[in-house]
Swiss-Prot record:
5'-3' exonuclease that plays a central role in telomere maintenance and protection during S-phase. Participates in the protection of telomeres against non-homologous end-joining (NHEJ)-mediated repair, thereby ensuring that telomeres do not fuse. Residues 470-487 have a biased composition (Polar residues). One of its GO terms (biological process) is interstrand cross-link repair. This is 5' exonuclease Apollo. A motif (TBM) lies at residues 501-532. Residues 367-386, 453-468 have a biased composition (Basic and acidic residues). The TBM domain mediates interaction with terf2. The keyword Hydrolase applies. It is found in: Chromosome, Telomere; Nucleus. Interacts with terf2; the interaction is direct. It is an enzyme of class 3 (hydrolase).
Length: 571
């Protein structure tokens, strides 16, 4: 999730993980893309959400957020918000058009903490620097920068150039139907431009049409099948089977406007580098023009590229939090559960399950009851590998891992241990005969048989994006990183690879225990080094040597695990 809690303030932007925001009182939303709304749902009832007027409408349409929690702020105006309960400290915020997707804005914050500019996702244009709030050589203390395309080796064309490339592809295929793969929001101006150029209706589904009506775009869209030459589908619909079916009815080409480094493997699929994020050169121009004192990347690390562009005149100053703001940040936030509306306990529940942990690092679980007020001043924008546990915890207690006798479903709860809290990632994996977890990888992405993503690692990708144990708390990303484990025939028995001292086992478990009870004990006590889990070696090693089954499935005669237990206990 691309969001931040601004340190030394009660402010969060695009961050909806409430356990990380216990001291936050002002929530801001830059735009409506799903990676910036993760954790936000119709049950939100905690604090007002500040956003642009258009994003406010989309919040109501797409997430059904109650109107009383939405606070639209006009773009280009100064807005004053209270930072305490006494009216002593105030915040001035100005919204700037981010040139990214409909309703997307940047936030310029000014207060006791100095001046901070949060870009959210944006595509830089020189006109941004001419808005009144950025004129007169304003000093930016901290710039939170969207560095999605922060790769000096990749050149991206402007959106106008990419649009011309798409138009030329369509001209080169007269009589062909055109299918364009997009996400649910964004690139609407491209569709309007193509409709005007080729004088045709653009066919969309009903859900997208509802969004387009909210955006009040020109009337060039329809839901009537076959009414126009151009049709918009979700990117995941661009598949070999669909292309074959479409071409049986009419000659069809597919176009994917994306900044992701992809190469088409199909003669009728065209990948065009159309991006709503700033190119590296544009980022360099933007940072150079603002010359901020310090820079915080939103997506990953980019300081090696921009350190020379930071202001040489000043050094970051220490922020002194006013006492009234401290009290405001410590006030009970009355955070409620997003599922059943019940008030959550402030104390951390005891975690149960199999802990995958490095032998060198002992798992420590902080308790909210022992935390003092200084916890609210933790810098959430810095990544400290020593502060975050490098393990994933699989909670296989009786309440979270069970077999449904009627459906045969399994539900697995993945929990990530962090320095401040335990973030529960609910991965309700429903298994049936027709779908495995591995088939869920492609949801929302084009068919890999048609295109492949270039083996090109961007400098913006942080270490947290590369390993499951230090990955994003987004449930989809974490679960996909575990696919190599789920795809094997056994999940729970992975814990049996690294065995403890046999003497400690026999002393802790009486010989009279049945093998299944012993197996449960193994799963609750064995550890696997995080580096082995990261490389996916654990399960592959097990499957090469044993025919292992999950504990709640029938065991074959002569199960090697039972034999291993007997050997272990005989030592």
């Amino acid at each position: 999730m691309n969001g931040k809690v601004l340190p030394d303030t009660p402010i969060a932007v695009d961050c909806w993980q409430l356990r990380k925001c216990l001291h936050v009182r002002l929530f801001f939303l830059s735009h409506m893309h799903s990676d910036h709304t993760c954790g936000l749902s119709s049950t939100w009832s905690h604090r007002p959400i500040y956003c642009s007027p258009l994003t406010a409408k989309l919040l109501r349409l797409k997430l059904q957020i109650k109107q009383k929690w939405i606070r639209p702020l006009e773009i280009g105006q100064d807005h004053m918000l209270m930072l305490d309960d006494l009216g002593k400290e105030r915040l001035t915020v100005n919204l700037i058009d981010a040139n990214h997707c409909p309703g997307a804005v940047m936030f310029l914050f000014q207060g006791y903490f100095g001046t901070r500019l949060y870009t959210g996702d944006f595509r830089y244009t020189p006109s941004m620097l001419r808005v009144p709030c950025l004129q007169n050589h304003i000093n930016i203390d901290v710039l939170y920068l969207d560095n999605t395309n922060c790769d000096p080796t990749r050149a991206l064309p402007s959106r106008q150039q990419a649009t011309q490339q798409i138009k030329q592809i369509i001209r080169d295929h007269p009589g062909y139907a055109v299918v364009i793969g997009l996400y649910s929001l964004g690139k609407e101006s491209l569709l309007v431009d193509l409709a005007m150029e080729f004088k045709t209706w653009v066919e969309v589904d009903r859900e997208r049409l509802e969004t387009l009506r909210v955006l009040q775009l020109p009337d060039v869209f329809t839901t009537d099948s076959g009414a126009g030459r151009i049709r918009v589908v979700n990117q995941s619909m661009i598949s070999a089977s669909n292309l074959m079916a479409w071409n049986k009815l009419q000659s069809t080409i597919a176009i994917l406007p994306t900044s992701r480094p992809m190469v088409s493997c199909h003669p009728n699929v065209y990948v065009v580098p159309y991006s709503d994020h700033s190119s590296y050169q544009e980022l360099e121009d933007f940072v150079s023009a603002l010359s901020p004192i310090s820079l915080v990347p939103i997506v990953g690390n980019c300081l090696p590229y921009f350190s020379s562009l930071l202001s040489p005149r000043k050094k970051p100053k220490a922020v002194v939090i006013p006492e009234s703001v401290k009290q405001y940040m410590m006030t009970n936030s009355n955070i409620r559960s997003s599922t059943n509306g019940m008030i959550q306990r402030t104390s951390r529940p005891e975690v149960r399950g199999v802990v995958f942990d490095s032998p060198e690092t002992k798992l420590s679980q902080p308790n909210h009851d022992d935390m003092d007020s200084n916890d609210t001043e933790i810098d959430h924008d810095t990544t400290d590998r020593n502060s975050d546990s490098d393990c994933i915890l699989l909670d296989m207690g009786t309440n979270s891992y069970h077999r449904d006798n009627d459906q045969g479903n399994k539900r697995l709860k993945l929990i990530r241990i962090e320095s401040e809290d335990v973030v529960t990632v609910t991965s309700s994996l429903t298994m049936d005969d027709n779908e495995s977890v591995s088939t869920r990888k492609g949801i929302g992405s084009p068919d890999p048989s048609l295109i492949y993503e270039c083996d090109h690692e961007s400098p913006t990708k942080s270490s947290k994006e590369k390993s499951p144990e230090m990955g994003s708390t987004n449930s989809g990303e974490m679960c996909s990183s575990m696919d190599s484990m789920h795809d094997q025939t056994s999940l729970t028995t992975a814990a049996a690879l690294t065995l403890p001292n046999p003497q400690s086992v026999t002393s802790a478990i009486p010989i009279t225990l049945e093998s299944e009870q012993f197996e449960h004990w193994l799963l609750e006590n064995f550890t696997i080094p995080a580096e082995e889990l990261k490389e996916g070696q654990v399960l592959r090693g097990l499957c090469e040597n044993y025919r292992l089954n999950p504990v709640d499935l029938p065991k074959p005669v002569g199960d090697p695990l039972e034999a291993a237990i007997k050997r272990l206990m005989s030592n």
